[in-house]
């Protein structure tokens, strides 16, 4: 009885973050499938945010995405923060996949194109919400002071 050997799946798992939104992208060999929370990119509303998500695809061209399937899970944050987290996760996943399974030259080419267009596609934005302090309604604003 001969056992079939299954070759390991070529896949990478990468996350993208913006404020409190976290997107986890799972990228494996495939045929150009791109889904966010189980839905295709075309179903994302409003259209303005959909265009933001398509930036990595438009920059690199469809042929770079043709050989991979990317599935993204996203949670936390607001609509815009989630979109930025997703586009970062997609970009980082593609770079990581090309580094691990394709070749270093094409990975560097992809990385250079993305960084030249918008650095936040690969590098996280460190800005966070400042905590509120006592003596005022917000982080910096103070309550009004009266002298008489």
Curated annotation (Swiss-Prot):
The GO cellular component terms are: cytosolic ribosome; cytosolic small ribosomal subunit
- A Pfam family: Ribosomal_S9
An example Gene Ontology biological process: cytoplasmic translation
Keywords from the UniProt entry: Ribonucleoprotein, Ribosomal protein
Enumerate the GO terms in the molecular function aspect.
Answer: RNA binding; structural constituent of ribosome
The superkingdom listed in its UniProt entry is Eukaryota
Q: Which family does it belong to?
A: Belongs to the universal ribosomal protein uS9 family.
Q: What is this protein called?
A: Small ribosomal subunit protein uS9
To which species is this protein native? Drosophila melanogaster
């Amino acid at each position: 009885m001969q056992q079939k050997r299954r070759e390991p799946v070529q896949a990478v798992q990468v996350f993208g973050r913006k404020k409190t939104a976290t997107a986890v992208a799972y990228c494996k060999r495939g045929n150009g499938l791109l889904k966010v929370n189980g839905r295709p990119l075309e179903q994302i509303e409003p259209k303005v945010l959909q265009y933001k998500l398509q930036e990595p695809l438009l920059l690199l061209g469809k042929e770079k995405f043709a050989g991979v399937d990317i599935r993204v899970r996203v949670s936390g944050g607001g609509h815009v923060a989630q979109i930025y987290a997703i586009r970062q996760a997609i970009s980082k996943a593609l770079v990581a996949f090309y580094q691990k399974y394709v070749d270093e030259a094409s990975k560097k080419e992809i990385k250079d194109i993305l960084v030249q267009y918008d650095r936040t596609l690969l590098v996280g934005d460190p800005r966070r919400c400042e905590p509120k302090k006592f003596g005022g309604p917000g982080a910096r604003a103070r309550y009004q002071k009266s002298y008489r």
